[in-house]
Swiss-Prot record:
It comes from Thermobifida fusca (strain YX). PANTHER family: 30S RIBOSOMAL PROTEIN S13/40S RIBOSOMAL PROTEIN S18, SMALL RIBOSOMAL SUBUNIT PROTEIN US13M. PROSITE patterns: RIBOSOMAL_S13_1, RIBOSOMAL_S13_2. Residues 108-126 have a biased composition (Basic residues). This is Small ribosomal subunit protein uS13. The keyword RNA-binding applies. Belongs to the universal ribosomal protein uS13 family.
Length: 126
């Protein structure tokens, strides 16, 4: 089983797709990595030679921040924004959307399950 950056890549997938299992590598970075290392994107993971795997590992380690390092950096960036009290930090602290999305309706992913708030009672008919 091929391991890159501490992640087991699925054996039967194409290398281009399998690399996207690593946090911090998407389709475009995977394609760039394969182009720079000279590995054919259509190759299946189980067909990779040890030499190609070493090339991929070295290229990724040298050029990209992935997995734990990237997660730590993102978490540190969010913590910093919360500490300095900027608008984005306040939105993170309150658990609301950070990038300007509307919140009167929608935003359920960030806000969580609906909490019903008591509203005005309608006046009865006389």
């Amino acid at each position: 089983m091929a391991r890159i950056a501490g992640v087991d890549l699925p054996r039967d997938k194409r290398v281009e797709v399998a690399l996207t299992y690593v946090y911090g590598i998407g389709r475009s970075r995977a394609a760039e990595t394969l182009a720079n290392t000279g590995v054919n994107p259509d190759t299946r993971v189980y067909q990779l030679t040890e030499e190609e795997l070493v090339k991929l590992r070295e290229w990724i380690d040298a050029n990209y921040k992935v997995e734990g390092d990237l997660r730590r950096e993102v978490a540190a960036d969010i913590r910093r924004k919360i500490e300095i009290g900027c608008y984005q930090g306040i939105r993170h602290r309150r658990g609301l959307p950070v990038r300007g999305q509307r919140t009167q309706t929608n935003a359920r992913t960030r806000k969580g399950k609906k909490k019903t708030v008591a509203g005005k009672k309608k006046a009865g008919r006389k």
